[in-house]
Swiss-Prot record:
EC number: 3.1.4.-
GO cellular component, one term: perinuclear region of cytoplasm
Function: Hydrolyzes lysoglycerophospholipids to produce lysophosphatidic acid (LPA) and the corresponding amines. Shows a preference for 1-O-alkyl-sn-glycero-3-phosphocholine (lyso-PAF), lysophosphatidylcholine (lyso-PC) and N-acylethanolamine lysophospholipids. Does not display glycerophosphodiester phosphodiesterase activity, since it cannot hydrolyze either glycerophosphoinositol or glycerophosphocholine.
Family from the record: Belongs to the glycerophosphoryl diester phosphodiesterase family.
GP-PDE domain segment(s): 39-308
Enzymatic class: hydrolase
Protein name per Swiss-Prot or TrEMBL: Lysophospholipase D GDPD3
Originating species: Homo sapiens (Human)
Gene: GDPD3
CDD domains assigned: GDPD_GDE4 (cd08612)
Membrane topology: Multi-pass membrane protein
Extracellular compartment residues: 24-198
Gene Ontology terms, MF aspect: lysophospholipase activity; metal ion binding; phosphoric diester hydrolase activity
Length: 318
């Protein structure tokens, strides 16, 4: 045992020192990647706290606030039209208990006159525009605006249609593939490998594990965006579990694991933009930028724009 310790302890010490050294200097092992665009202000569902989610009116409002990114979810209609909709089932959005895929685009119902803001419980958005929009409409209206397109399920036809639209409108570098599932992301990458990738849940866990094991400086990272929930919002505006105690436990553990300046700085220097969602209060904006986040995704782009304009360069510290 003593002989094992004699060799193991120096080896572990050397490994730890090397890991810390390269964690702080990733450019010595990896070629820095210059971003095509940077996300400071991302509009969740087009800014669903100010106007009805995913409508053209909401998108226009977000762009008036100089949003850097429109965060979208897409579904496929029966006649193979890619529409911007968070839910597959239309009941919450319109009151009609039908799936998007069971209707042609022209038969899709209007949104309700008001919709509750998911990450601001008790708050409702209204708007004069209640029509669902096609993804192609947004590509035509905002040809050079970066967008994140999240795929919820394993709908290969939807993935192919989106990949084709991105190519047709020459948006390969400014349209991000997003999905929670690695199996779905694999299909997205195969359909259009030129589009930048965001982390899936399992890949995010792998990065955290690698960071705490000291492996992160030595492994390749193909993703360019790390979209992550801010632990501060758990049990306040975000309730992943029905049990309050579990939510509180997750808030404490995830805050300890994720809110690390050295982790975020390393990812940034590797060309990975760290963007926290879905933050709707100034205290949360402050929490995200204080640990060095690239940007924030919000339901209230006007509030975030006001914060960024008032804080200037100080909104991002490292």
């Amino acid at each position: 045992m003593s002989l094992l310790l004699y060799y193991a302890l120096p080896a572990l010490g050397s490994y730890a020192m090397l890991s810390i050294f390269f964690l702080r200097r990733p450019h010595l092992l990896h070629t820095p990647r210059a971003p095509t665009f940077r996300i400071r202000l991302g509009a969740h569902r087009g800014g669903s706290g100010e106007l009805l989610e995913n409508t053209m009116e909401a998108m226009e409002n977000s762009m008036a606030q100089r949003s850097d990114l429109l965060e979208l979810d897409c579904q496929l209609t029966r006649d193979r039209v890619v529409v911007v909709s968070h839910d597959e089932n239309l009941c919450r959005q319109s009151g009609l208990n039908r799936d998007v895929g069971s209707l042609d685009f022209e038969d899709l119902p209007l949104y309700k006159e008001k919709l509750e803001v998911y990450f601001s419980p008790g708050h409702f958005a209204h708007g004069s525009d209640r029509r669902m929009v096609r993804l192609e409409d947004l590509f035509q209206r905002f040809p050079r605006t970066p967008m994140s397109v999240e795929i919820k399920g394993k709908n290969e036809e939807l993935i192919r249609e989106i990949a084709g639209l991105v190519r047709r409108y020459d948006r390969n570098e400014i349209t991000i593939w997003a999905s929670e599932k690695s199996s779905v992301m694999k299909k997205c990458k195969a359909a259009n490998p030129e589009m930048p990738l965001s982390f899936t849940i399992s890949r995010g866990f792998w990065v955290l594990l690698s960071y705490y094991l000291g492996l992160l400086p030595f492994i390749p990272i193909p993703e360019k965006f790390f979209f992550c929930f801010l632990p501060n919002i758990i049990n306040r505006t975000y309730f992943p579990f029905s049990c309050s105690c579990l939510n509180q436990l997750l808030a404490v553990v995830s805050k300890w694991l994720i809110m690390r300046k050295s982790l975020i700085r390393h990812l940034e220097e590797r060309g990975v933009q760290v963007v926290f969602w879905c933050l709707n209060e100034e205290s949360d904006f402050e929490a995200a930028f204080s640990v060095g986040a690239t940007g924030v995704i919000t339901d209230y782009p006007t509030a975030l724009r006001h914060y960024l304009d008032n804080h200037g360069p100080a909104a991002r510290t490292s």
